[in-house]
Amino acid sequence: MTATPEVQKSIEEVYTKLQGASDCSSLLKKHLTKDVVAKNKSKKTRLGATLLDVIQSGGENLDSGVGIYAPDAESYTLFADLFNPVIEEYHNGFKATDTQPAMDLGEKNVGELADLDPEGKFIVSTRIRCGRSLQGYPFNPCLSETNYKMMETRMKEIFNSITDPELKGTYYPLTGMDEETKKKLIADHFLFKEGDRFLKAANANRYWPNGRGIFHNEKKTFLVWVNEEDHLRIISMQNGGNVGEVLARLIKGLNLVAAKAPFARHPRLGWLTFCPTNLGTTVRASVHIKLPKISAKDDFKKICSDMKLQIRGIHGEHSESKEGIYDISNKQRLGLTEYQAVRQMYDGLKKLIELEKAAA
Ligand SMILES: Nc1ncnc2c1ncn2[C@@H]1O[C@H](COP(=O)(O)OP(=O)(O)OP(=O)(O)O)[C@@H](O)[C@H]1O
């Protein structure tokens, strides 16, 4: 199977557009070389995905940080000429010959994670999420409407079977959810945003809102997103800085779901996700934090990036910080264990709080 001449022409057009875009600094632009285009433009996965499916979001959104997505699991192998260097650069030097370590969520270590901010002076809230793909289904651009609905039905059955008093809750499909409820869930940081242009350009928003929804317990401290960017996003969050409590709840919830739904894992890349930035552990552990003194300094971004921390705005990726509150998380998700990913955030934040306390 080979890509049509039209698709190959579109791939070349994306390449030319990126090379001519002086304002673009995405990893796609850097690693989509003439040679990579020539070697890969005619390839097609067994499900029919091409290099165009991989690069079209970054081609349309020149402000992308990364710019590529995997339309199916095979893409990570078939288009390795592009994925491997992007993965290596994003995940702290994870090489094509490296392998994701076995899963270690840190069950035995949660006790080491004392509250980062017991006096409640800095941290507004803590959240740890991981992504999962259900075995047997491709990713967004290759999913049919029936696939989305079947996955949602399967997940509803699993949610209904949860009896743990802390975790049990209700699934709310996006279809039929009233605008007011939706807006409030998004504003309160519980639900994913709609109409993300990066995902739209990657063909990830088809048949919306069918098959999409959110499960949460009564306190909204354990949540599962269904069919947004990934098949599943499993989330634990609460106010304050008690990372240990948040992690313990995530582990409990993840184990419950995993016992009923087999997830797709790659022998080298770990848990599989739609975006290569989430491969491996898929863990993003974040706090919403106020650091008025050090965040005003010129070297704040550098201090964070030296500690492998990522800074986002208050409403998530591609949003701005408001009222001096930042979303700070681990950046690397591949090439370390789940516990180490959480620890990367934890140790870095401990240091940032010390610096804030010491700042004049
Ligand atoms: N520590 C936190 N406390 C409260 N809300 C949070 C925290 N971290 C992230 N959020 C909220 O979670 C929502 C999703 O954020 P965002 O999309 O950036 O991250 P994500 O779910 O990790 O996925 P992705 O990295 O794929 O974008 C946003 O509303 C964001 O404000």
Swiss-Prot record:
GO biological process, one term: phosphocreatine biosynthetic process
EC number(s) stated in the UniProt entry for this protein: 2.7.3.3
InterPro entries referenced in this protein's UniProt entry, alphabetically: ATP-guanido_PTrfase, ATP-guanido_PTrfase_AS, ATP-guanido_PTrfase_cat, ATP-guanido_PTrfase_N, ATP-guanido_PTrfase_N_sf, Gln_synth/guanido_kin_cat_dom
Catalysis performed (reactions): L-arginine + ATP = N(omega)-phospho-L-arginine + ADP + H(+)
Annotated positions binding substrate: 65-69, 229, 275, 317
Principal EC category: transferase
Stretches assigned to the Phosphagen kinase C-terminal domain: 122-359
Name of the protein in its database record: Probable arginine kinase ZC434.8
Membrane spanning stretches: none
Binding locations of ATP: 125-129, 189, 233, 284-288, 312-317, 327
Domain Phosphagen kinase N-terminal: 10-92
Family under the similarity heading: Belongs to the ATP:guanido phosphotransferase family.
PROSITE patterns (alphabetical): PHOSPHAGEN_KINASE, PHOSPHAGEN_KINASE_C, PHOSPHAGEN_KINASE_N
Cellular-component GO terms for this entry: extracellular space
Gene3D superfamilies listed in its UniProt record: ATP:guanido phosphotransferase, N-terminal domain, Glutamine synthetase/guanido kinase, catalytic domain
Gene Ontology terms for molecular function: arginine kinase activity; ATP binding; creatine kinase activity; kinase activity
Keywords: ATP-binding, Kinase, Nucleotide-binding, Transferase
